[in-house]
Structures are given as C-alpha cells and as structure tokens.
C-alpha cells in the first residue's frame, strides 16, 4: 500500500508576480498592488522587495507609502490574474486529476502512487515549478507531506521559490519547533492567548492534554491537537460548482451619485451574467447588497418569474432592488454588490420572442469578444460612463 503524499502548490506573491511578468520594468523593485496611496484602500499584494520595508497584505496603502516612499503603486487587474490562475490550474491538472484549488494562487494535489510517472514526488514538484516558471514567468513554492496541513506549512517553509518535502513519519518532528503562528486556523487572538500561556511552538501545542486544550479553544481543539502533529485526514476534494455568483465593490469615496451607482451596478451585473452564461446556466434569484457610509448593510432579493441569463434582465431586476433601498435611505453609499443564485439549465423553447432572441445574440457576441480580447474590450453605453467618473 502506497504511503499518502499530498502536494501544496502556492504561487509566490501572485498578484505582484503577474504584474512583473507582463511588465519586466517592475522586476526586482518594490511593487504594491492595491491602487494609489492617496485613495482609501489596502495593500492587496506586495513584492518581496516591498516586504523588506515591513509592508504586508491588508495594510492601509497610506501606511505602505510612508514605509516605502519609492514603492511602485499599481491598480489590480483581476481579469489578468484570473487568466493566469486558469493557466496555473491547467498545468497542475497535467500532473494529477485530483486537484483542489484554494483561491486563485494555490492548490492541493493528491499525488499518492505517482512516483512511477516522475521518478519521485520531489522530481514531480521540480517539474511543476519549472513549467510554471517557463509558461507563466512566475515562481511557485511547493510543500509535500502526508497531509494537507503539513504540506501547506511545508510550503511556507519553502518560500520563496523553493520546495520542501516532509518525509513520511517525520511530520511531528518537522512541525515541533515551528511557531504556532504558522498553523492554518490559528489567528492573531488565538496566537496571543496561547503564547500568554507559554505555548509558542507546535510541539508544545501537540503535547498539551486534550482536556486543557479544549478548555482553551473549545470544539476546535481536537483538530489543532492532531494538526500540530501533522495528522489531518481531510481528502483532496475536487471543487463542486458554486451555488451562487456575486460581485461587489467598495468605492474610493462614499457617493450618492445615482448615475454612477447605476453604471457600476450595470458593470457588476454584466460580470456575473457573463460567468453565468459561460457555465451554461440560468438564474432564478437576483440579490442586491448596499453598505452605507455608517457601515449599515442592507440586502434585498427577488425571485424571477422565469429563469434568466441576460444582462438586461438581471440588471433591471437589480436596479429595481437598489432603487427600493435608496428611496428609503439616501445616505452616501460605501459598497455596492449584486449576486445571483438558484441556478438551472437553459430552458428549451419552441417559440422565442424576437426581441429576446436579439438580446441573447447580443450577449453571445459580447461574450465571444470579451473571451478573446478581455472583458473591458467592449462596453455598454451605461458602463462606459464610468470612464468619465474617476
């Protein structure tokens, strides 16, 4: 019987690495993805050169600017990142069909028994890293172990641009000297609480009596106790199809501008309906989400009379929901989001309304153009107005 081997693959500083791949002039420079520092926002990603100044994800952009005035600040290009992510996952799927994506830039691979195909699992990891670098122009780090949790921690030890394999049976000794902060699931508050008790390494965590650990951490204690020894029986799971699609955006400044809000809502609606049609689905439910300047958040949803997948149908429904909220509360809006759910397959119809048929053809044409040239290559009149509003 083969010894279980799990691989965790993580693209190093993903957003920034993609930007450096397409813009070589950014190589070896402190680059920060997140937007202009004078705008409200946080660091989405920082290059390793920027991290040397203490900059990290989630930090306010203005703070990052103070720490590293010479840093290059750029807007994120999420369409580009998704394209790179798709290519990344395709590369991984060439090595194992048992693939579990974890966001855009990392994934688990079940590689038990694959040694005969590649010489060894370590050689397999080297091949994966070489292909990623050759085809995407970015680096990856890989951890290999007998479980998902140990593999992920091994990846962190391998960064940047390296690989780390934990020999079978040596998981506990590998993890024992590491700081408890490296354990997935231990947040800042839990870390501080444990360290206040003198528990600062995974070895000390693993040695705690189960009853004591449960009194500290509650029902999460058994998992952490096992994980600290590298014991984690969770399988690598193929992703199931998402049951909803949503998009939201936080504005740089709070706004009451109705024209701007409608244009942004139209853009968000076009994004989610394009994804819906790409899946060959229709939706029965449309939801709107609005967060006001005082952080009050309201949501509304509507069940459609007939399943739909068209830009116009989804947008008009979302617009009606948005206006229903704004008519009763005219505070400035901080965040706007739209979502769809309760999917079904396309309905077969013997007769189609000519006007609806024309709109479906228009949506299909827009989809083809955008798939080839990018989402922003063609825009509707309403979303085009956004160009003049920044």
Swiss-Prot record:
GO molecular function, one term: damaged DNA binding
Obligatory cofactor(s): Mg(2+)
Domain UmuC: 6-187
GO cellular component: cytosol
Gene3D superfamilies according to UniProt: 3.30.70.270, 3.40.1170.60, 5' to 3' exonuclease, C-terminal subdomain, DNA polymerase, Y-family, little finger domain
Listed SUPFAM superfamilies: DNA/RNA polymerases, Lesion bypass DNA polymerase (Y-family), little finger domain
Binding residues annotated for Mg(2+), in chain numbering: 10, 105
Site, Substrate discrimination: residue positions: 15
Catalytic activity from the UniProt record: DNA(n) + a 2'-deoxyribonucleoside 5'-triphosphate = DNA(n+1) + diphosphate
Active-site residues from the entry: 106
Cofactor note: Binds 2 magnesium ions per subunit.
Enzyme class label: transferase
Subcellular location, record wording: Cytoplasm
Domain of life (superkingdom): Bacteria
GO BP terms, alphabetized: DNA-templated DNA replication; error-prone translesion synthesis; SOS response
Pfam families: IMS (PF00817), IMS_C (PF11799), IMS_HHH (PF11798)
InterPro entries assigned: DNA/RNA_pol_sf, DNA_pol_Y-fam_lit_finger_sf, DNA_pol_Y-fam_little_finger, DNA_polymerase-Y, DNApol_IV, PolY_HhH_motif, Rev_trsase/Diguanyl_cyclase, UmuC
Keywords for the protein's UniProt record, in alphabetical order: Cytoplasm, DNA damage, DNA repair, DNA replication, DNA-binding, DNA-directed DNA polymerase, Magnesium, Metal-binding, Mutator protein, Nucleotidyltransferase, Transferase
Primary role: Poorly processive, error-prone DNA polymerase involved in untargeted mutagenesis. Copies undamaged DNA at stalled replication forks, which arise in vivo from mismatched or misaligned primer ends. These misaligned primers can be extended by PolIV. Exhibits no 3'-5' exonuclease (proofreading) activity. May be involved in translesional synthesis, in conjunction with the beta clamp from PolIII.
UniProt record similarity statement: Belongs to the DNA polymerase type-Y family.
NCBIfam families from the UniProt entry: PRK02406.1
PANTHER family given in the database record: DNA POLYMERASE KAPPA, DNA REPAIR POLYMERASE UMUC / TRANSFERASE FAMILY MEMBER
Protein name: DNA polymerase IV
Organism for this UniProt entry: Dehalococcoides mccartyi (strain ATCC BAA-2100 / JCM 16839 / KCTC 5957 / BAV1)
Lineage of origin: Bacteria, Bacillati, Chloroflexota, Dehalococcoidia, Dehalococcoidales
Gene symbol of the encoding locus: dinB
């Amino acid at each position: 019987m083969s010894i279980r081997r799990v691989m965790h693959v993580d693209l190093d500083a993903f957003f920034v690495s993609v930007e450096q791949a397409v813009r070589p002039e950014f190589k070896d420079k402190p680059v920060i993805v997140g937007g202009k520092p004078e705008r409200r926002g946080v660091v989405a990603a920082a290059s390793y050169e920027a991290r040397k100044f203490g900059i990290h994800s989630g930090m306010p952009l203005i703070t990052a600017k103070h720490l590293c005035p010479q840093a290059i600040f750029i807007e994120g290009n999420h369409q580009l990142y998704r394209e790179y992510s798709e290519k990344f996952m395709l590369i991984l799927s060439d090595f194992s069909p048992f693939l579990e994506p974890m966001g855009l830039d990392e994934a688990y691979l079940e590689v038990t028994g694959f040694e005969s195909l590649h010489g060894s699992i370590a050689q397999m990891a080297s091949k994966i890293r070489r292909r990623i670098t050759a085809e995407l122009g970015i680096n990856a780090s890989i951890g290999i172990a007998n479980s998902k949790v140990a593999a992920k921690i091994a990846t962190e030890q391998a960064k940047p641009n390296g690989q780390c394999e934990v020999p079978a049976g040596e998981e506990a000794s590998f993890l024992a000297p590491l700081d408890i902060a490296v354990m997935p699931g231990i947040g800042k508050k839990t870390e501080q609480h444990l360290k206040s008790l003198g528990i600062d390494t995974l070895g000390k965590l693993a040695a705690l009596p189960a009853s004591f650990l449960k009194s500290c951490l509650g029902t999460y204690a058994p998992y952490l106790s096992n994980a600290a020894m590298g014991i984690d029986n969770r399988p690598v799971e193929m992703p199931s199809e998402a049951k909803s699609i949503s998009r939201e955006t936080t504005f740089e400044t709070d706004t009451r501008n109705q024209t701007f809000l409608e244009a942004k809502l139209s853009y968000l609606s076009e994004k989610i309906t394009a994804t819906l049609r790409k899946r060959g689905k229709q939706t029965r439910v449309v939801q709107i989400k609005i967060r006001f300047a005082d952080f009050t958040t309201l949501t509304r949803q509507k069940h459609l009379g007939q399943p739909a997948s068209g830009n116009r149908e989804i947008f008009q429904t979302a617009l009606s929901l948005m206006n229903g909220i704004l008519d009763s509360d005219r505070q400035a809006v901080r965040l706007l989001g739209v979502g769809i759910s309760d999917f079904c397959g396309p309905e077969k119809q013997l007769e189609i309304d000519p006007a609806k048929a024309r709109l479906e053809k228009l949506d299909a044409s827009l989809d083809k153009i955008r798939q080839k040239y990018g989402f922003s290559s063609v825009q509707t009149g309403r979303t085009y107005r956004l160009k003049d509003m920044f």
